[in-house]
């Protein structure tokens, strides 16, 4: 089984776009959808009002930006042996799950490139499938410029590749998952990628660019991550496993699991 883990914090309209993409999937392998919720308001009610079903919602308290713990919680409750990490606000191809799964390889992350769309383009493609959305977005000069840059990255296949990815669950757990010491925006994915490559993992790049819908920038995140010092400490520690992770969570608050 495949577990598709979608990180969520409010912005239900963006989540709906991603869930609708997942509903359209053409996949020969059984998969589950897990929402990793960082303390959204009224999420279950909105899902029920919009008729969504067969979804597992794993929610923790809203105690600030805790993406690492949020994702680890989802993995703890997952049934699949292969994990695909996504965020809300993404538009993916109708065969996304199947084609990602077909590229699977032990000790390998399948890494996703994405193009962050303008507000105007995002409004035009809201509700469209991937192919139609790409057609509309291609009329945007900024989108075309970004895609040219992403195409170069695809050809170069850089060794370092933070961000969203897919991998075998057993490999993720072997590294003790994401480090939950990263509280606040930024660098948890860079640190995981650093450990992954330092201790025998490799990166494979998915061959299509995902679309990321516009949403207002959160000024509280700042330009430089508050986690820079912790990131440097962990990279210099020489440890394969996260300090606080899948097996030893950070924080005393319990998460809640609901099935709809």
List PLM regions with ranges.
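Glycine-rich, basic loop-to-helix element that forms the pyrophosphate-binding segment
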Residues: 61-78
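Conserved donor NDP-sugar-binding/catalytic core segment of glycosyltransferases
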Residues: 95-133
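Short, acidic, metal-binding catalytic loop of nucleotide-sugar glycosyltransferases
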Residues: 20-30
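Short, flexible, basic/aromatic active-site loop/helix in glycosyltransferases
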Residues: 130-157
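C-terminal catalytic/acceptor-binding lobe
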Residues: 160, 181-260
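Short aromatic/hydrophobic "clamp" motif used to bind/position activated sugar donors
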Residues: 83
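Short beta-strand/loop segment that forms part of the nucleotide-sugar
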Residues: 30-39, 58-60
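A conserved acidic beta->alpha catalytic loop
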Residues: 36-46, 90-91
